[in-house]
């Protein structure tokens, strides 16, 4: 629990005791006391509507009740500096400045752990994201999903949730058959032999490179081999080549996974048919027109879904159900799937399947990643300058940088369409959101270096009561909100709230810096207090950027 949360608990308890004394209720009769942070700081640090909640019980006007509570509240002079009644009966609190200055040594001590909480303790989540087919490069939708999924996992971990990250490798089905046939054609081509390229084959430069690798590795060993033998070998090599490329690109993007789960393993370990039998035992399977159906309309889907077609082949839905059953059987309380915009219609049937398996539909959450459109100098960019083809994640990183790519993708809620301004992402001005935040961190680092050169080290024992300007306290207030913002972003599945917070923190720091001299050798005690203050801002900026997979540079 952080200092701000402790003070909120103290304040709530103090309000409860004031109500008991002023209104004559037993503690158990006092309704839940809600605290809000007013949008306008002129209305205090916190506000409560408890007087309005009590109006019916006390049979008095809310303002009259508030007037009886306030004298009791004013008896605590350690926490509360001022109390006022606003409007029809809101009670606004201005807390003593000490509650903020107490934050500084706490943040300095917790350092990289500042922002952590046990909010989500005891809940086990799995986040499955990206899960692109291993048949080509990651596109912009994958990149946005990777940034949001990884950031969300980081945020939820900091908020105390037990989180596992998973990539589902779609290594079964027709797309893999086409990959193997494409690799086979490029293998023959690399050996100077003619070969018909498959109609639905993959024509990317990576497949040409794969064909050359196969030719270099095997020579003409498989030219005259049977198709079954050759394709069986090439399947292994092709999947290793493509998944290796995906892993490398994601690692470069600072995205890692705890588990890479193979779809093929569902068949090898006999996980598919038992899932079907469980659905049958639960009474939701029926046969019609030679096909096997799941009655998803029992769970608000718009129509029933085919699991096994009349020719005996599986639809994509059946192994997907088996995979989700496998995840739940691994002990996860909640599954968070991050899907592309084209999968929106898939949500009702999958939630229906979860319920048909005997689980709560609330154990599956789906975050949809909406489309990304690139713009440069106001003009939409559809093709890569380098390749003349669709822009890939790798292209975007090379063009605007890794930090800007990660930060910009985290700036907007995942369910909103995004216009990615490449010109803005590359600019070195405060108009660029990531530059603005990183520059605040770099500026603090520069001041701390200058202080060190003059023999001034940051100390937890600095006299923080010497901080008394409005800008100093505004900065402290923002710093104190960090753990709550992290917890809120975790619960709302909203990494963009961290972006918004970092912008607010950078703004509070810049305002402080522009109105207060930090290094004042004629006033060393104040200087020491301000050095400690900006160090806490540096720590918090770094911790927030780290959640988003963005670096915190010490020089810019």
Swiss-Prot record:
Q: What is its EC number?
A: 6.1.1.19
Give an example GO biological process.
arginyl-tRNA aminoacylation
A GO CC annotation recorded here is: cytoplasm
Q: From the UniProt record, list the coiled-coil ranges.
A: none
Q: Where in the cell is it found?
A: Cytoplasm
Q: Name one Pfam family in it.
A: Arg_tRNA_synt_N
**Has keyword Aminoacyl-tRNA synthetase?**
yes
Q: Name one GO molecular function term.
A: ATP binding
Q: What is its main location?
A: cytoplasm
What keywords sit in the KW lines? Aminoacyl-tRNA synthetase, ATP-binding, Cytoplasm, Ligase, Nucleotide-binding, Protein biosynthesis
Location of motif 'HIGH' region in this chain is 132-142
Q: Does the keyword Aminoacyl-tRNA synthetase apply?
A: yes
Enumerate the catalysed reactions.
tRNA(Arg) + L-arginine + ATP = L-arginyl-tRNA(Arg) + AMP + diphosphate
Q: Which InterPro entries match?
A: aa-tRNA-synth_I_CS (IPR001412), Arg-tRNA-ligase (IPR001278), Arg-tRNA-synth_N (IPR005148), Arg-tRNA-synth_N_sf (IPR036695), ArgRS_core (IPR035684), DALR_anticod-bd (IPR008909), Rossmann-like_a/b/a_fold (IPR014729), tRNAsynth_Ia_anticodon-bd (IPR009080)
Belongs to which family? Belongs to the class-I aminoacyl-tRNA synthetase family.
Subunit structure of this chain's protein: Monomer.
- Its recorded name reads Arginine--tRNA ligase
- Give the originating organism: Listeria innocua serovar 6a (strain ATCC BAA-680 / CLIP 11262)
**Taxonomic lineage:** Bacteria, Bacillati, Bacillota, Bacilli, Bacillales
């Amino acid at each position: 629990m952080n200092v701000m949360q402790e003070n909120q608990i103290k304040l709530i308890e103090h309000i409860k005791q004031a109500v008991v004394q002023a209104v004559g209720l037993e503690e158990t009769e006092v309704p839940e006391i809600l605290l809000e942070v007013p949008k306008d700081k002129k209305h205090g640090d916190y506000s409560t509507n408890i007087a309005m909640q009590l109006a019916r019980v006390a049979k008095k006007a809310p303002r009259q009740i508030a007037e009886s509570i306030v004298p009791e509240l004013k008896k605590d002079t350690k926490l509360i500096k001022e109390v006022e009644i606003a409007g029809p009966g809101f009670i606004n609190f201005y807390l003593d400045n000490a509650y903020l200055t107490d934050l500084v040594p706490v943040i300095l001590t917790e350092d990289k752990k500042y922002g952590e909480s046990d909010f989500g303790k005891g809940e086990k989540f799995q986040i499955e994201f990206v899960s692109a087919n291993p048949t080509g490069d990651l596109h912009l939708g994958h990149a946005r999903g990777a940034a949001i999924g990884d950031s969300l996992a980081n945020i939820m971990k900091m908020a105390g949730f037990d989180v596992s990250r998973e990539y589902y490798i779609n290594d079964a089905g027709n797309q893999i058959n086409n990959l193997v046939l494409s690799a086979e054609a490029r293998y023959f081509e690399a050996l100077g032999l003619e070969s018909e390229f498959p109609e639905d084959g993959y024509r990317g430069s990576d497949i040409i490179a794969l064909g050359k690798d196969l030719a270099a590795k095997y020579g003409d060993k498989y030219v005259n081999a049977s198709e079954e033998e050759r394709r069986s070998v090439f399947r292994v090599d092709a999947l290793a080549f493509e998944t290796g490329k995906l892993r490398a690109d994601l690692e470069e993007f600072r995205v890692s996974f705890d588990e890479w789960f193979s779809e093929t393993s569902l068949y090898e370990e006999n996980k598919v048919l038992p899932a079907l039998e469980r659905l049958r035992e639960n009474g939701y399977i029926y046969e019609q027109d030679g096909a096997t159906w799941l009655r998803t309309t029992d769970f608000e889907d718009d129509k029933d879904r085919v699991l096994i077609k009349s020719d005996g082949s599986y639809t994509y839905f059946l192994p997907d159900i088996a995979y989700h059953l496998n995840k739940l059987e691994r002990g996860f309380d909640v599954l968070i799937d991050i899907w592309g915009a084209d999968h929106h219609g898939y949500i009702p049937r999958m939630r229906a399947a979860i319920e048909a398996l005997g689980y709560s539909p609330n154990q599956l959450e789906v975050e949809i990643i909406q489309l990304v459109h690139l713009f440069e100098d106001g003009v939409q960019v559809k093709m890569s300058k380098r390749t003349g083809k669709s822009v890939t994640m790798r292209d975007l990183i090379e063009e605007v940088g890794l930090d800007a790519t990660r930060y910009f993708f985290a700036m907007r809620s995942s369910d909103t369409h995004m216009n990615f301004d490449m010109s803005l992402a590359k600019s070195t001005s405060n108009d660029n959101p990531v530059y603005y935040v990183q520059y605040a961190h770099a500026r603090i680092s520069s001041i701390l270096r200058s202080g060190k050169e003059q023999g001034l080290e940051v100390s937890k024992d600095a006299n923080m009561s010497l901080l008394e300007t409005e800008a100093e306290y505004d900065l402290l207030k923002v710093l104190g909100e960090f753990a709550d913002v992290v917890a809120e972003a975790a619960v709302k599945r909203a990494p963009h709230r961290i972006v918004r917070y970092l912008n607010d923190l950078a703004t509070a720091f810049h305002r402080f810096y522009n109105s207060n001299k930090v290094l004042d050798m004629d006033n060393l005690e104040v200087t020491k207090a301000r050095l400690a203050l900006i160090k806490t801002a540096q720590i918090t900026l770094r911790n927030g950027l780290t959640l988003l997979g963005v670096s915190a540079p010490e020089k810019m």
